[in-house]
Design a protein with these regions (language model features):
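Secreted/periplasmic carbohydrate-active enzymes, especially glycoside hydrolases
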Residues: 1-343, 347-351, 396, 411-412, ...
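Substrate-binding/catalytic cleft of secreted carbohydrate-active enzymes
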Residues: 204-206, 318-320, 328-595, 604-605
Length: 608
């Protein structure tokens, strides 16, 4: 099996053609396209950009809210000189499931909307000709998928997504599509692990190929080769190594080659950063030095393009994070586009990488009622659907770690977001996931999950599996919001005293906290939704953080305003952003800039 999640790279042995652009598009509400032959000829003149969400490009509500099957179609040319190579199609993501056809022949199926997949089409394509590429996608939600939800049918027969999660169900081909020509024998994967020494660093590596020819691995600093080794496993010894660090990223070029005599059979290039990350004595240590995490929970979300990869927006986001003094973000609530991790590698940002395990709670109202403990709930992990959910969860976790394990920016894995984890089935569900993450990751990064408001120190059955505890807390907003801010602080401190008793030396971070603020809304005295109230809430919350030595990070919710399912609790989306959806600062941004640019990197380091 030649499955590989390596990022597409053009080298002396590999060729790439990008297929992004305007494709043809059609909804298929009756799911008749396959039988009607749409894989060979899509009966539509509608165009659609790739990558992008289709939702916000339309002006009618039925199209924006469409739920069900939908099709994309384009054509691609295969050069004659590619004959003799393996021809592979690679999709960065299709939300939430896809069937891929080439010249009418089905070549791939994939479940999961946030990770890449590929299809080998060597024996299907016609060389020196144009070939038809069709994608049948589907965006329905269920309790066996990540993220979780349901799909309802309206009175007129239309389907509508009913998510258990608080972000919009953007759908489409969201990330780049590549046509690749690869050598028959090639590099499929590699992994690295780092050790710092008195004279530099050592990099233990493992390379996976689909053949038996010898492998060499070289490390370059610019044009200078600084280390080399041979074999599919080995160690690169780097003297006077330049370490990758926060806002001081240093990247080396890794070159992996397969040889047959004097010929190079395959060559794969990547950029890596030498760094270590661990938890010791209740502190996060980057290259052996304490680092206090500060930054955001985020979303891949922007005007018009929805969740589609947009590099100008990515660039703006990183510039804003640098301006405000952040050093970390969580990929809430799903793995992001690979290009975002590459920029984090280059800019020196830390990432808590999150699998799309969100919506793992059920309420007769919505996510908010579940978060407050209102509405009728049941144990989410004691259902008939649980075995299928766990299988899909393991598959997504495996692909995320396989894809992202070599990024120096990735420092931890988040295995779930706000699951209902006080019921009897929690431990049976959690245990194999945490064991799998530890087994798959050669660097043994710390593992966590974000803890729901109703999961307290004495009721959460999942927290014992986490290497560090991650809390989502909204004292002063969802709990005791408004005039009772002093009471909210007292309740907050009471809960924190409880966590102090169960951490057993582990650090604790906040992966969510915040209030909604309508940009430009001012009120004296303050009221909820105003800029003044948002700042008062943040000052109170930060005072609590600073009081507890075991708090080792703060990731505010959210980086920017983002779209959600419409409802009476959301004014055209979630407004907890420190920046507007258009990436302009709210008043609170200046509060964070003052705090984060003055906090030392090793804030709360262990006092000797």
């Amino acid at each position: 099996m030649n499955r590989s999640l390596l990022y597409p790279r053009a080298t002396t042995t590999r060729r790439l053609i990008g297929l992004d652009g305007m494709w043809r598009f059609s909804f298929d509400p009756e799911s008749k396209g396959v039988e009607a032959g749409w894989a060979l000829d899509l009966p539509s003149s509608l165009s659609m950009p790739v990558p992008a969400s289709f939702c916000d490009l339309f002006t009618d509500k039925a199209s924006r809210e469409y739920c069900g099957d939908f099709w994309y179609e384009t054509s691609f040319f295969v050069p004659a000189e590619w004959s003799g190579w393996d021809i592979v199609l690679r999709f960065g993501s299709v939300t939430h499931r896809a069937r891929v056809f080439v010249n009418g022949v089905e070549v791939a199926q994939h479940e999961g909307g946030f990770l890449p997949f590929d299809a080998t089409v060597t024996n299907i394509v016609r060389y020196n000709q144009f070939n038809k590429l069709s994608v049948l996608a589907n965006n329905e939600l269920s309790e066996t998928m990540l993220p979780a939800g349901t799909t309802r049918t309206l009175a007129d027969g239309r389907k509508i997504a009913a998510p258990y999660f608080d972000f919009y169900n953007y759908s489409g081909i969201h990330r780049p599509v590549w046509l690749m020509a690869l050598p028959k024998e090639r590099v499929l994967d590699y992994s690295t692990r780092y050790r710092l020494t008195e004279t530099g660093a050592e990099i233990d590596y493992t390379v996976s190929t689909n053949g038996t020819h010898p492998v060499t691995v070289e490390l370059y600093d610019g044009t200078t080769r600084v280390a080399e080794s041979s074999g599919t496993t080995g160690t690169l010894v780097v003297k006077n190594a330049k370490l990758w660090n926060v806002h001081a990223a240093y990247l080396y070029d890794l070159v992996i080659r397969i040889h047959e005599g004097s010929a190079v059979v395959d060559e794969y290039l990547d950029r890596i950063g030498i760094r270590t990350f661990e938890i010791r004595h209740g502190r996060f240590l980057l290259n052996g030095s304490p680092v206090y995490l500060r930054g955001f929970g985020r979303h891949e979300d922007a005007d018009i393009r929805g969740r589609g990869l947009d590099l100008p927006t990515v660039k703006r986001d990183f510039e804003l994070m640098k301006w405000i003094g952040a050093n970390c973000f969580r990929t809430s609530h799903y793995p992001y586009a690979e290009e975002i991790y590459q920029m984090a590698d280059e800019e020196g940002f830390l990432i808590i990488d999150e699998v799309p395990a969100v919506g793992f709670m059920q309420s007769t109202a919505n996510f908010l009622a579940a978060n407050q403990g209102n509405g009728r709930q049941q144990g989410f992990f004691e259902k008939e659907t649980t075995p299928a959910l766990l299988k899909n969860h393991k598959a997504a976790l495996t692909d995320m770690i396989d894809r992202d394990k070599n990024h120096p920016s990735v420092i931890a894995w988040s295995l779930l977001n706000e699951p209902q984890c006080t019921s009897a089935g929690t431990e049976e569900y959690f245990k194999p996931l945490f064991e799998l993450a530890r087994r798959l990751d050669p660097q043994k990064r710390p593992r966590t999950y974000t803890v729901l408001m109703t999961s307290l120190p004495d009721t959460s059955k999942g927290q014992r599996f986490a290497d560090f505890v991650s809390l989502n807390r909204y004292y002063g907003w969802y709990v005791l919001g408004g005039a009772g801010l002093a009471d909210a602080e007292a309740s907050f401190r009471h809960e924190m005293d409880g966590w102090a008793k169960v951490l057993h030396g582990r650090p604790l971070i906040f992966t969510e906290y915040g209030t909604d603020n309508l940009s430009g809304a001012h009120k004296l005295p303050s009221v909820m939704w105003s800029a003044e109230y948002q700042n008062e809430y943040l000052e109170m919350t930060h005072a609590v953080f600073d009081h507890y030595d075991f708090v080792q990070g703060e990731l505010v919710w959210n980086f920017a305003d983002f779209q959600t399912t419409e409802g009476i609790l959301r004014v055209d989306g979630n407004k907890k952003g420190i920046f507007t959806r258009q990436r302009q600062p709210k008043d609170a941004a200046y509060l964070f800039r003052k705090r984060w640019t003055t906090l030392p990197v090793d804030f709360k380091k262990r006092k000797k």
